[in-house]
A protein has these predicted regions:
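Oxidoreductase cofactor-interface core, primarily capturing Rossmann-like NAD(P)-dependent enzymes
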Residues: 2-46, 53-66, 73-86, 93-102, ...
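Intrinsically disordered, low-complexity segments enriched in small/polar residues
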Residues: 40, 88, 97, 264-266, ...
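Short secondary-structure boundary micro-motifs
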Residues: 47, 165-166, 268, 274
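Short, charged low-complexity linear motifs
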Residues: 91, 130, 136, 272-279
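A hydrophobic C-terminal alpha-helical subdomain
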Residues: 204, 239-304
Length: 304
């Protein structure tokens, strides 16, 4: 029937990004939603149907995408053994073969290209290299969304740590005065994705839609925490010294150096893209001060 709702298949439906997409699509009511997950029995979200799909097993993708009008695709760099270009390439190929009309890919800036090879941030660049695969696939519509530096991480794994005097603080190799962090509540990315599917004429020609709730420095973050009654400090250390602090510190230092030099989203103005993202989402993302006021619960040992 012509009145039947179009079907959107959502990869990573149990995760931060995919879960938010399912919620936003469900609240909008324009589409049927198929959650794609490696654990259908454990899925507890708002999707209309749940189907097994594993990006490590391309043979599972044809059935998972059958009948879908749209696909939201996201990969997880931090999952051990993940090859994002291979996974996303297989999913794009399967989506095209299934007749998908609109594919939305969750990407990040190409740090390698932006910095001329100065900085290596594979969790960004690997996703960016999938963009050309999406563009060349020949979908009727394709869109790119750009997740921010998650607010959640700044009170979790990348939040202030316990200092020798018992207070909380950051000790990092970045100038705390430099405003370079494009941040946001990752739960709100779904509003942009749902809006992009609902307004393909505005977004489906390869638009890049970043979620940006705030643009901040670490000093800005400290000021907000202190204003909420928390004793939080920031200490800048040389990158060379920081590299020996813990396994993976060198890679985090590289990422922070990129931020300080080029910002999270890269150089230049991003105002037009942010404005379009907010327009199709139908709302302005939550600023960090408001998010922190409503949700901030600092602990001595942040949890992931």
């Amino acid at each position: 029937m012509s009145s039947e709702k179009r079907l959107i298949a959502v990869f990573g439906a149990s995760g931060n990004q995919g879960g938010g997409v399912v919620r936003a699509l469900s609240q909008g009511g324009r589409f049927r939603i198929r959650a794609l997950t490696r654990d259908p029995a454990g899925y507890e979200g708002a999707a209309d149907e749940v189907v097994f799909a594993d990006l490590e097993r391309p043979e599972t993708l044809a059935a998972a995408l059958e009948g879908a009008y749209g696909v939201f695709l996201v990969t997880n760099f931090w999952q051990v053994g993940t090859d994002e270009i291979r996974q996303a390439g297989a999913a794009v190929q399967a989506a095209k073969a299934a007749g998908v009309q609109h594919l939305i890919w969750s990407t990040l800036p190409d740090v390698e290209a932006i910095s001329g090879g100065e900085f290596k941030v594979p969790q960004f660049t690997g996703k960016a290299k999938v963009d050309s695969i999406v563009k060349q696939a020949g979908f009727a519509r394709h869109t790119f969304v750009i997740p921010p530096a998650y607010y959640q991480n700044f009170v979790g794994p990348y939040g202030p740590q316990t200092q020798p005097d018992g207070s909380l603080g950051w000790t990092l190799p970045i100038d705390p005065k430099v405003r370079c962090l494009h941040m946001g509540d990752i739960g709100e990315l779904g509003d942009i994705v749902a809006g992009a599917f609902a307004h393909p004429d505005e977004t489906g020609d390869g638009a890049y839609l970043p979620l940006v709730g705030d643009f901040m420095s670490f000093n800005d973050l400290v000021d907000i925490f202190v204003g909420l009654g928390h004793k939080v400090t920031f200490t800048q250390v040389p990158r060379e010294a920081y590299a020996g602090f813990f396994p993976g510190a060198d890679a985090l230092g590289e990422t922070l150096a990129y931020y300080q030099t080029y910002t999270y989203l890269g150089p230049g103005s991003h105002d037009a893209r942010i404005a379009l993202a907010n327009k199709v989402a139908g709302k302005t993302p939550t600023p960090f001060a408001v998010w922190a006021r409503d949700r901030l619960r600092l602990a001595a040992t942040p949890s992931v």
